[in-house]
């Protein structure tokens, strides 16, 4: 597998299919988000009133939630450009600055609120979750609603993720995402129980929003999963562009089936990976039944072709900037 660092992968997939669709909603279940950051100016963000949202301050949970949200919803030509800036974002905090961890009750509440507000995709970061092994009745009920609504749940595939818990709760449309470095090695390990249903993507040196208006570089499965949640939103937008009904469950299957084989270090590591735009195009073609060219679908790609009259580069650096 060709070595790709996270920042390169992040740039490769920017503005595929024009940046998404306002009718597609992606819920971010992580820490609170500092929506005053310049990258969110113009973003369609809807804060949800979860238990964790009432206890936010400028702490580690808010820093992580802000970085995660910017990877998806950061606006074009801002200091952080996200994968799906035109999609609608539902901010449903589950982690608090004043307390470590997330209870099953808080997780279930955030899922339910996200569904009430029309979420098509859930992104759930890893962290300290309640150690109780069996899912609660409330969490099982929330997951059942996700299954009924055909909602795709994208989770961190790291050891501290909640993918195993959600699987035991009955989740049928679950996509764990692990992070790999330039040499293809998993960053921070992975949940061996989920290796056969997930993918790995470059997750080192991902640039995102930080507190007090600055930017920072982070790495790990939480951030890699955010990129794939954004990509899933792009795929649903591509379906809409072709007059098809968005199908989150099918989008998850298309992501899995368009992955590149990965030479994993261990048998219980994820055997599939995404490394660039070619994977998005393959997934979109599988999902829509129509050959997809992300550059042709994007106004930024059309701009470059008009300016250069040359072969379109796949790299997102070739786009107009304000």
Model region roles, listed by residue range:
Residues 20, 144-148, 200:
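Anion (oxyanion) recognition and catalysis
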Residues 30, 165-237, 241:
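Extracellular S/T/G-rich loop segment that most often corresponds to the catalytic His/Ser-adjacent loop
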Residues 73-77, 112-120, 144-148, 179-182, ...:
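Sec-exported extracytoplasmic/periplasmic mature domains
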């Amino acid at each position: 597998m060709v070595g790709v660092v996270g920042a390169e992968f992040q740039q490769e997939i920017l503005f595929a299919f024009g940046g998404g669709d306002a009718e597609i909603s992606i819920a971010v279940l992580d820490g609170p988000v500092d929506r005053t950051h310049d990258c969110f100016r113009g973003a369609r963000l809807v804060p949800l009133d979860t238990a964790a949202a009432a206890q936010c301050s400028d702490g580690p949970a808010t820093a992580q939630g802000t970085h995660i949200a910017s990877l998806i919803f950061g606006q074009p030509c801002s200091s952080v450009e996200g994968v799906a800036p035109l999609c609608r974002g539902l901010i449903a905090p589950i982690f608090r600055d004043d307390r470590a961890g997330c209870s099953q009750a808080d997780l279930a509440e955030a899922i339910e609120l996200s569904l009430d507000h029309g979420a098509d995709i859930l992104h759930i970061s890893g962290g300290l979750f309640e150690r109780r092994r069996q899912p609660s009745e409330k969490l099982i009920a929330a997951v059942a609603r996700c299954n009924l609504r055909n909602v795709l749940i994208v989770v961190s595939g790291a050891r501290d993720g909640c993918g195993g818990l959600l699987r035991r709760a009955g989740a049928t449309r679950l996509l764990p995402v692990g992070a790999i470095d330039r040499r293809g090695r998993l960053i921070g390990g992975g949940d061996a129980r989920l290796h056969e249903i997930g993918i790995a993507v470059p997750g080192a040196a991902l640039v995102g929003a930080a507190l007090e208006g600055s930017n920072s570089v982070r790495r790990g499965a939480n951030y890699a999963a955010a990129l794939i949640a954004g990509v899933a939103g792009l795929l649903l937008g591509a379906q809409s562009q072709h007059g098809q009904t968005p199908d989150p469950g099918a989008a998850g299957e298309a992501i899995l089936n368009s992955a590149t084989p990965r030479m994993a270090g261990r048998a219980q590591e994820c055997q599939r990976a995404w490394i660039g735009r070619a994977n998005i195009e393959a997934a979109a073609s599988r999902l829509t039944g129509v050959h997809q060219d992300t550059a042709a679908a994007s106004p930024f790609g059309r701009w470059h072709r008009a300016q250069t009259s040359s072969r379109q580069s796949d790299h997102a650096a070739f786009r107009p900037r304000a």
